[in-house]
A protein has these predicted regions:
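Bacterial N-terminal signal peptides
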Residues: 7-17
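Positively charged n-region of N-terminal signal peptides that target proteins for export
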Residues: 1-5
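Sequence signature of WD/YWTD-type beta-propeller architectures
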Residues: 19-484
Length: 484
């Protein structure tokens, strides 16, 4: 059988290949219509507390552009091919706009031809959580240095570093997650010899060593329990590989993985022997909204790397005892990857307990470069599960998180160029209907044209974490609390 994958040592010779540069004035994933804009904010639904939707006309030789926004008896006109609002003017314009529609009328001369376009922007009655954390990282194979975890206020353009490479001796860091979308309850990792799990509980920071001698590795993926005492995690032996053919570029897969529970009150790890099967891989656990169940992904082991495309992860559920931290022995299948010839990762329960969102790709658990990767939505009341095809991009849609009101979610997507992940927001109503996703607004209309880093693991919070890089340095230099 022909080996589908190349080793890292061989691929080092291929790292110098590049891609041709196209016309920077033309957006790969710009809007439709007579006048192409990027980012595409045509016919989207937004929360009233979002930052200004700044955009540019992504066409060559744009002249005499005039864009008029109308909301009731209010009207604002911006001239030029880059439409950038002053923050105060945008906020004033949106005062009392909840439940109403903005009409945008655009006129411009493009390559000597006068064009007119019109679209609407619906303002939702539901606000979105005001803070978004993400890791900024090069979309490459070996670049883990010069990494940072940032917190952005989505109501304006303020961005603060929570942790960065300059304050951690160029250590790798990853996976900042909020517990129940709370700003004062979160966790992230600093990797390496001086690393640890940085737990934020009500503003108090702790550096934890979530690893015992009997575990495969330190904790990798996981989530914090709503009550604050426990966390559920996977321990993974992770290997990278590369496709010899132009299919999905990079792969990351587990050669071994188990589940474990961390007791933050008693500094102990709780093994789950009845779940940690020798003939299966378990990963990506999360809690139900009430904290009484754990959802996770599990697959039968296969021979690696040749058998990776046969790794089909199921989505399963088990009870969780919030008094003891014990995961129940009965495991029920929520969605079978094997039956659907597909694979599940990244399950996330909505805070109101109604929905469970997860990611589906053809195989494995690293869908970042899988263009087929799609978000699925499970209604935990009715049992209905469906692919969210209506919001699917032309490239992978992967990691996602919920706003605390369960009416908005954000997800990472490589739609467009296929290289750089960006955070997209989407509204979900009480019946599970979605609206057209829109990308995180930026102060400069040309930001995404020149940005060369991926937004990785976008996670919403209802308040600021309050953490800074000085805190990261202090934690980096601190001794880790040992877990038994």
């Amino acid at each position: 059988m022909r080996n589908r994958f190349l080793s890292l040592s061989i691929l080092a010779l291929l790292a110098l290949t590049g891609c041709g540069a196209g016309d920077p004035a033309i957006a790969v994933d710009g809007s439709e219509g007579p006048l192409v804009i990027y980012p595409d904010y045509k016919d989207v639904t937004i929360p009233a507390n979002i930052a200004p939707l700044n955009f540019r006309y992504a066409m060559p030789d744009v002249r005499k552009a005039k864009t008029t926004f109308t909301l009731g008896d209010k009207s604002v006109t911006i001239r030029g091919d880059e439409v950038e609002w002053r923050l105060g003017a945008w906020k004033k314009f949106l005062e009392g706009a909840e439940g109403q529609s903005i009409t945008v009328t655009a006129k411009a001369v493009v390559e000597g031809k006068p064009l007119t376009d019109q679209w609407s922007i619906q303002v939702s009655e539901d606000p979105v959580d005001g803070w978004l954390t993400y890791r900024l990282i090069e979309p490459s194979y070996q670049m883990y240095h010069e990494v940072s975890i940032l917190e952005r206020c989505v109501e304006n353009f303020d961005e603060t570093a929570i942790c960065d490479w300059q304050h951690t001796d160029n250590a790798c860091m990853n996976c900042h997650v909020h517990g129940q979308s709370r700003g004062d309850y979160s966790l992230y990792y600093i990797r390496g010899p001086q690393g640890g799990s940085i737990l934020n509980q009500n503003g108090k920071l702790r550096k934890l060593s979530l690893k015992t001698d009997g575990m495969l590795s330190a904790t990798v993926y996981g989530e914090l329990h709503p009550d604050g005492r426990f966390g559920v995690f996977s321990t993974n032996v992770i290997l990278p590989s590369f496709h010899a053919e132009a299919v999905a570029r990079m792969e990351v897969f587990d050669s071994a993985s188990d589940l474990t529970v961390a007791d933050f009150e008693n500094n102990r790890m709780i093994n789950v022997p009845h779940v940690a099967r020798a003939d299966a891989w378990e990963t990506f656990p999360c809690f139900s909204a009430d904290g009484r169940a754990v959802f996770y992904c599990v697959a039968d082991t296969v021979s690696l790397p040749d058998g990776l495309m046969e790794a089909k992860y199921d989505l399963v559920r088990a009870d969780f005892d919030p008094e003891t931290g014990i995961i129940g022995e009965q495991v029920d299948t929520v969605w079978s990857g094997r039956t659907h010839n597909a694979s599940v990762c990244h399950p996330k329960a909505s805070p109101d307990g109604r929905w469970l969102m997860f990611t589906v790709s053809d195989y494995g658990t690293f869908p970042l470069f899988h263009p087929e990767c799609t978000l699925y939505l499970a209604d935990l009341q009715s049992g209905e599960i469906r692919p969210m095809d209506e919001i699917k991009g032309n490239k992978s849609d992967s990691y996602h998180s919920w706003s605390s009101n369960s009416r908005w979610f954000v997800f990472a997507s490589k739609r467009g160029d296929g290289q750089y992940g960006k955070p997209y927001f989407c509204h979900l109503d009480s019946d599970g209907r979605t609206t057209k996703p829109f990308v995180l607004p930026q102060k400069s209309a040309r930001f995404y044209l020149y940005n060369l880093k991926s937004f990785n693991v976008p996670d919403l919070g209802n308040a600021s974490t309050g953490m800074t890089v000085r805190d990261a340095r202090r934690m980096f230099e601190a001794e880790s609390e040992i877990f038994q």
